[in-house]
Amino acid sequence: MVARGRTCERSLNILFVINDLYTRGNGLAASARRTITLLRERGHHVRVLSAPPLDGDDCGVGVPEYPLPSMSVPVVGSLIASQGYAFARVRRAQVKRALQWADVVHLEEPFYLQAVVAQCARRAGVPALVTYHIHPENLTASIYLDRACLLNRMILELWKRAIFNRCSLVQCPSQSVWDRLEPLALRPPLLLLSNGVPLGEGVDGADARGDEGDSSVVRILAVGRFSREKDQATILRALRYSSHARSIELALAGRGPTERALRAQASALLSDGVITRPVRFAFMSAPELAREASRCDLYVHAARIEVEGLSALEVLRLGVVPVIARGPLTATSQFALSGDSMYEAGDSRALARAIDRWVERGRQALVSEGARYRGLGERYDIRACVDRLEDAYVRLVSADVSHA
C-alpha cells in the first residue's frame, strides 16, 4: 500500500524508543505502530529500540532492530502486566549502537529507558523529540494516588529534568497537554500536534441503528482500558440515576485490571432490577468496534485522565453522538460539538442527566446530531499529522526548531 501523504525529499534514519511496542489494547503503542508504518511507507528508515513481542506477534511492524530484554518489576509487576504492558531492561551498548545509526530519535514514553536514551543522544549530538503520551496521574491512579498533588508534581518535575529538557522538541497531542506543560518553562519548544487517526480503518459505511431488534432499546458503547482513571465505574453508577436505565443496553469494550470489579458492579445492576439487559464486556478489534459503533445510539467516554482520547474519535467519526467527561486532566471533551455532550468527570448523576436528555430527544435527533460528527476525524487525519511530524524531524536534523 502506498501512503497518500506527501513523500519527504530526504530519507531519514528515525529511531523509535518504546518499552513495549507490541502490546494490544494500549493506545500509546497502537499510535506508535501506525506512525512507524506511515513513515516507512514514505521512504524513511525507521528502527525500533524496544523489548520484543512476548508472544511472537510483531503486530505487522516487525521485531525490534535493537531488542532489549523484558524487565520484571518487583511488587508491581502483576499490576503492570494486568494493564497489558511490559518494561524493557536498559542495555547501554544497545542504546549506543542504535544512536550511531540514527539521524533523529523519537521517545514515546517518560520512563527510565527514555531518560537513558535522552542523555546518551544529547551527548552523541543526536536530536530527540519526545511525545507527552501520559500524565503522572495515569500511573498513580492505579495505586489510588492520582489526587496526591505533591507526588504528581514531583513526577512531572522528574520527567522535565531527566527527559524533556534533554530533548529538542516536546510534542503535545492536545491543547490540554500544552496548557499543562507551558507553565513549566521547558528548555525545548512545544509542538501542538495530534497523534492522529487513520480515517479509513474499520469504516465500511454500514449503519445499523434502528435496524436490529426492538427500536425502543437504547444502545450505549464505551471504549477504553478497564482501569480507575478510565472510570467505567461512573458509567455503571449513572445507570442507577437514569430514567431510561431499563431500556439501555450497554457495551464496555476493553480489558484491564478493574474488569472483575466492573463485572460485579454490572451484575448488581441486573440483580437489583436497575437494568433488564446484561452489560456486555468485550475486547474488540478495529472492525469489530466499527460494527458495534454502527448499531449504537450513544458513546460515553468517562475517563478522568486522558492525554488525547483518540479511541473516542474513532467511534465518533462513525456518526455516534457522544457524552464525554470534562475535567482538568482529560482532553477528550475537545471532540464534543455541544455542551449537551459533556458532563463533569466523575459525576454519575450529571452523566445520567446527559444520557436522559439525548434519549428523550428521540432517535431522529440522535441521527441528525451524529451526522455532525462524521467529518470530525478529518481534522485529525494521521496522514496530515505525519506530514507535520516529518517537518519536525527535518528541522531537528537541520538544527532549526525555532518554528516548531
List the predicted regions and their residue ranges.
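Conserved acidic donor-binding segment of nucleotide-sugar-dependent glycosyltransferases
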Residues: 337-348, 357-363
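Short hydrophobic beta-strand element within catalytic cores of glycosyltransferases
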Residues: 321-326, 330
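Aromatic "clamp/platform" in nucleotide-sugar-dependent glycosyltransferases that forms part
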Residues: 110, 304
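Nucleotide-activated donor-binding/catalytic signature segment of Leloir-type glycosyltransferases, i.e.
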Residues: 260-284
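Membrane-proximal helix-turn-helix segments that form the acceptor-binding/catalytic region
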Residues: 123, 136, 151-169, 184
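Carbohydrate-associated surface elements
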Residues: 52, 176, 196
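Conserved donor-binding/catalytic core segment of Leloir-type glycosyltransferases
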Residues: 15, 171, 209-240, 251
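Short alpha-helical donor nucleotide-sugar binding micro-motif in glycosyltransferases
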Residues: 99, 164, 283-284, 291-296
